[in-house]
């Protein structure tokens, strides 16, 4: 059975939206490198944990944005084209994985 997402891309995203997501991820990458430096420099564990929590929150925000965008565009388009059942099933699977974290 072919997966719904094998041929899908972020085509519906504007260049500005892609840049915003990329910039968010680059900031998160910088935060993670900062955490790595904190560990290497034997910083206080609580300070490191606070930074890890901030990274987790930032990643969750990016994921929520992508999840919302996917529902509004990809899933909605699939429903309109008659392929909604598979798209909804895929969305629910992703949502279940997302809520486990």
Curated annotation (Swiss-Prot):
Tell me how this protein assembles: Homotetramer. Binds DNA with a stoichiometry of 2 tetramers per DNA.
Q: Which residues form a coiled coil?
A: none
Task: Sum up the protein's function in the record's words.
Answer: Copper-sensitive repressor that has a key role in copper homeostasis. Negatively regulates expression of the copZA operon and of cutJ/ycnJ. In the absence of copper ions, binds with high affinity to the copZA promoter and represses the transcription. In the presence of copper ions, CsoR binds Cu(1+), which significantly decreases its DNA binding affinity and leads to the transcription of the genes.
Gene3D superfamilies documented for this protein: Metal-sensitive repressor, helix protomer
Repressor: present as a keyword of the record?
yes
Q: Which UniProt keywords apply?
A: Copper, Cytoplasm, DNA-binding, Metal-binding, Repressor, Transcription, Transcription regulation
Consequence of gene loss (knockout): Cells lacking this gene display a slightly enhanced ability to grow into medium containing high levels of copper.
Q: Into which family does the record put it?
A: Belongs to the CsoR family.
User: Any keyword Repressor?
Assistant: yes
Q: Which residues bind Cu cation?
A: 45, 70, 74
Q: What else is known?
A: Can also bind other divalent metal ions (zinc, cobalt and nickel), but these metals are poor regulators of DNA binding.
| Pfam families assigned to the protein according to its UniProt record, in alphabetical order | Trns_repr_metal
Q: Taking the first listed entry, what is the main subcellular location of this protein, grouped into a coarse class?
A: cytoplasm
Which cysteine pairs make disulfide bonds?
Answer: none
Q: Could you state one GO cellular component term attached to this entry?
A: cytoplasm
- The name on file for this protein is Copper-sensing transcriptional repressor CsoR
Q: Which organism is it from?
A: Bacillus subtilis (strain 168)
**An MF annotation (GO) of this entry:** DNA-binding transcription repressor activity
Q: Do you know which InterPro entries this protein is assigned to?
A: Metal_Tscrpt_repr (IPR003735), Metal_Tscrpt_repr_sf (IPR038390)
Query: Where does it reside?
Result: Cytoplasm
Return one Gene Ontology term, BP aspect: negative regulation of DNA-templated transcription
Region described as Disordered: spans on this chain: 1-22
